[in-house]
Amino acid sequence: MAFIQEIKRRMNTVKSTIKITNAMKMVSRAKFIKFKKQFQEISLFFNEFYKAVGQVVVSLKEPKKKPDNQKTLWIMMSSSLGLCGQHNSNMNKLLKANFKADDKIFFLGRKNQSFWNKNSQYNPAVGFIDIQDRDINFDYCQTIFDQIMDAFKEFKLDRICMVYTKFKNSLIQQSQLFQVFPFDVETFKTLNPVVTDQQLDFEPDQATIINLITPQFFDVALYGGLVETKLCESASRQNAMEAATKNAKDLLDKYTLQFNKLRQNSITEEIIEVIGGMN
């Protein structure tokens, strides 16, 4: 009888878990729809903007040769909440594979900062902003840009790269690296294959144009990366909670079957005892 009560207690616990994971799945679904709409609204502008900037970048005369020992400021876009599958760990794996001892990291989101604080011997963190969903807009990204550039100048780094998650579909998201500064020709050719090596005439001059578009490009890339990463986070959490709910339901079915068998055996034993007493 005691074991039957224990099984019943476990069943109640699993039922409570199902309610929680199912509620979290629905919340994640609502956020997914919100960020997908936002992402779709800005995608056309971003593609055309990257194409225009890319056409300018590939027209640069005599691009500077990249030194082999470039020191990088990594902008790590992670979540501030957990329970989102491999969303954060995949970005950590990608950055670990490309991180060098002199590199620094500016964290946008709390989760991956705690990972690097615990697992890195280099103390790479130079900035942290706990991004909330309601904060993600173009104006806010401009204030983030100022803080990132302050860190970039203070530590005398050579380039800035984003670590974000690219959205393929609701089931597939892929961690990506994207060089934001200085402009990289190959990056733009990868982003948009139609970008060509056609030479352009610049007015007033090439350097002035580059100086004008650099902060604008940074803001656009930052905003786009945050929106897309939040979209991927929502999709990943939705999938994780759906899997957790399914696993909990499977476990509940197992406990229910076990409970029914024990109850049946208990009732059978009681009937046998009653019949035996009558005899």
Curated annotation (Swiss-Prot):
<keyword id="KW-0406">Ion transport</keyword>
<keyword id="KW-0813">Transport</keyword>
<comment type="function">
    <text>Produces ATP from ADP in the presence of a proton gradient across the membrane. The gamma chain is believed to be important in regulating ATPase activity and the flow of protons through the CF(0) complex.</text>
</comment>
<keyword id="KW-0066">ATP synthesis</keyword>
<keyword id="KW-1003">Cell membrane</keyword>
<keyword id="KW-0375">Hydrogen ion transport</keyword>
<keyword id="KW-0472">Membrane</keyword>
<dbReference type="InterPro" id="IPR035968">
    <property type="entry name" value="ATP_synth_F1_ATPase_gsu"/>
</dbReference>
<dbReference type="GO" id="GO:0042777">
    <property type="term" value="P:proton motive force-driven plasma membrane ATP synthesis"/>
</dbReference>
<keyword id="KW-0139">CF(1)</keyword>
<dbReference type="GO" id="GO:0046933">
    <property type="term" value="F:proton-transporting ATP synthase activity, rotational mechanism"/>
</dbReference>
<dbReference type="GO" id="GO:0005524">
    <property type="term" value="F:ATP binding"/>
</dbReference>
<dbReference type="GO" id="GO:0005886">
    <property type="term" value="C:plasma membrane"/>
</dbReference>
<protein>
    <recommendedName>
        <fullName>ATP synthase gamma chain</fullName>
    </recommendedName>
</protein>
<dbReference type="InterPro" id="IPR000131">
    <property type="entry name" value="ATP_synth_F1_gsu"/>
</dbReference>
<comment type="subunit">
    <text>F-type ATPases have 2 components, CF(1) - the catalytic core - and CF(0) - the membrane proton channel. CF(1) has five subunits: alpha(3), beta(3), gamma(1), delta(1), epsilon(1). CF(0) has three main subunits: a, b and c.</text>
</comment>
<dbReference type="Pfam" id="PF00231">
    <property type="entry name" value="ATP-synt"/>
</dbReference>
<comment type="similarity">
    <text>Belongs to the ATPase gamma chain family.</text>
</comment>
<dbReference type="GO" id="GO:0015986">
    <property type="term" value="P:proton motive force-driven ATP synthesis"/>
</dbReference>
<dbReference type="GO" id="GO:0045259">
    <property type="term" value="C:proton-transporting ATP synthase complex"/>
</dbReference>
